């Protein structure tokens, strides 16, 4: 397939998906689209590429990078923020990585990141949260945190179905709710903004399916459904019920509930079973601190997932090192959690760890777990040796402050040493 402004490498092969099984077929020299991103993306993007190339080479593979464009780079080439070229290239090549994007005022949508996820139907936002030795943390035992959050990406109050106070539309909704749905007196008089919170069986089950499959493939002992169903019974309560239903329908032979764990197995989990349990969202935020090691894979809705993953990230050193990815049906778009920080753009000083570890998550999605392990080990060795960027150096006694590019070079050096 040809594109308007995108050059497809001659020396790589496409990742494909088996239509019957849904499994990826990944060559040893895949073409992977990359969006460097806005602001500090121009620094962390190339730094991550360098590290990912080294890990691929060390495990007998190579990556053929294909530059695609969104944000400021797309405006330069296409005079628009998110060209169809980019969406098509990612969809056709299945696996991609992007840096942070800034959504300009008047862009036509609230968020470039959200728009890209919606166009590709990337329904699961996946956030691994684990501590790297040497990274300062505000908690006493940060290494207890080793959790992966699956956050539903397309529904909930983030669906964007809302109406501004003072508009004709919001008045119609208010009247309908009060007069037709029997909620008279619930909404206070005066200006009001109203939003709708859709939670569907379809959206819930495909997210929980992804979370359980991840747990099974990665030897994770439990999946926890996080919800506020004690209050929002027909939305978040339905999420809980549909989650358990999916586990029983599709994974009944390899999952057990928490009740079954205690009633049938006296609290001892069989090695071939994943425990599916649920927690109320506010209690779960406490348990992240008080019972950290009890949780492995989290499956939750959009808003809860936003809170949960950021709170968990704080326990292991902050969002500057937090990786992420978005999964769809045979699609993966990896991205760091942090923003574009335009005031540091081009200064070669920011921490590229989140982008590097997002690439690690992408490699694992592709089945390159050996390369992924090498990246984590090399990053951890680099940081524990005190070779860090300015944000960590000021928190580490005796740290050696490195530029973005120098830090990437040091990680590459450690990859070669560890391989």
From Swiss-Prot:
Biological processes per GO annotation: glyoxylate cycle; tricarboxylic acid cycle
Protein's name according to its UniProt entry: Isocitrate dehydrogenase [NADP]
MF term (GO), any: isocitrate dehydrogenase (NADP+) activity
Positions bound to NADP(+): 102, 338-344, 351, 390, 394
Superkingdom of the source species: Archaea
One Pfam entry name: Iso_dh
Subunit-level organization: Homodimer.
Reactions listed under catalytic activity: D-threo-isocitrate + NADP(+) = 2-oxoglutarate + CO2 + NADPH
SMART domains named among the record's database cross-references: Iso_dh (SM01329)
SUPFAM superfamilies tied to this protein: Isocitrate/Isopropylmalate dehydrogenase-like
Cofactor: how and how many bound: Binds 1 Mg(2+) or Mn(2+) ion per subunit.
Residues annotated as site: Critical for catalysis: 158, 228
Cross-referenced Gene3D superfamilies: Isopropylmalate Dehydrogenase
EC number, UniProt record: 1.1.1.42
The family this protein is said to belong to: Belongs to the isocitrate and isopropylmalate dehydrogenases family.
Binding of Mg(2+), residues: 306
Key words, A-Z: Glyoxylate bypass, Magnesium, Manganese, Metal-binding, NADP, Oxidoreductase, Tricarboxylic acid cycle
Protein source organism: Haloferax volcanii (strain ATCC 29605 / DSM 3757 / JCM 8879 / NBRC 14742 / NCIMB 2012 / VKM B-1768 / DS2) (Halobacterium volcanii)
Enzyme class: oxidoreductase
């Amino acid at each position: 397939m040809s594109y308007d402004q995108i050059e497809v490498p001659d020396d790589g092969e496409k990742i494909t998906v088996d239509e019957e099984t849904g499994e990826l077929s990944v060559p040893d020299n895949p073409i992977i689209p990359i969006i460097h991103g806005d602001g500090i993306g121009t620094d962390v993007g190339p730094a991550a590429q360098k590290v990912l190339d080294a890990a691929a080479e060390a495990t007998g593979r190579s990556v053929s990078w294909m530059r695609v464009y969104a944000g400021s780079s797309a405006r330069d080439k296409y005079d628009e923020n998110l060209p169809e070229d980019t969406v098509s290239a990612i969809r056709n090549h299945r696996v991609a990585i992007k840096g942070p994007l800034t959504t300009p005022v008047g862009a036509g949508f609230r968020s470039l990141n959200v728009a890209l996820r919606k166009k590709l139907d990337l329904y699961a936002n996946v956030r691994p949260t684990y501590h790297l030795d040497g990274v300062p943390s505000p908690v006493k035992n940060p290494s207890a945190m080793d959790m992966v959050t699956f956050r539903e990406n397309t529904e909930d109050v983030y669906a964007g179905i809302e109406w501004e106070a003072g508009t004709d539309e919001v008045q119609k909704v208010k009247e309908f709710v009060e007069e037709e749905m029997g909620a008279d007196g619930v909404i206070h008089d005066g200006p009001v903004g109203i939003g709708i919170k859709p939670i569907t069986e379809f959206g819930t089950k495909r997210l929980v399916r992804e979370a359980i499959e991840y747990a099974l493939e990665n030897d994770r002992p439990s999946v926890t459904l996080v919800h506020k169903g004690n209050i929002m019974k027909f939305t978040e309560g339905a999420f809980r019920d549909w989650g358990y239903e999916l586990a029983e329908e599709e994974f009944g032979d390899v999952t057990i509930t928490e009740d079954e764990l205690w009633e049938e197995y006296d609290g001892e989990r069989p090695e071939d079973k994943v425990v599916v349990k649920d927690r109320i969202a506010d209690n779960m935020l406490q348990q992240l601190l008080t019972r950290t090691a009890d949780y492995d894979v989290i499956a939750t809705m959009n808003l809860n997932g936003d809170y949960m993953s950021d709170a968990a990230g704080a326990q292991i050193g902050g969002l500057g090192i937090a990786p992420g990815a978005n999964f769809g049906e045979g699609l993966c778009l990896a991205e760091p959690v942090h923003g574009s920080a335009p005031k540091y753009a081009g200064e070669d000083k920011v921490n590229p760890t989140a982008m590097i570890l997002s690439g690690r998550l992408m490699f694992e999605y592709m089945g390159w777990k050996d390369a992924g392990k090498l990246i984590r080990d090399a990053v951890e060795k680099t940081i524990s040796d005190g070779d860090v960027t300015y944000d960590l150096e000021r928190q580490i006694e005796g740290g050696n402050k490195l530029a973005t590019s120098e830090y990437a070079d040091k990680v590459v050096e450690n990859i070669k040493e560890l391989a």
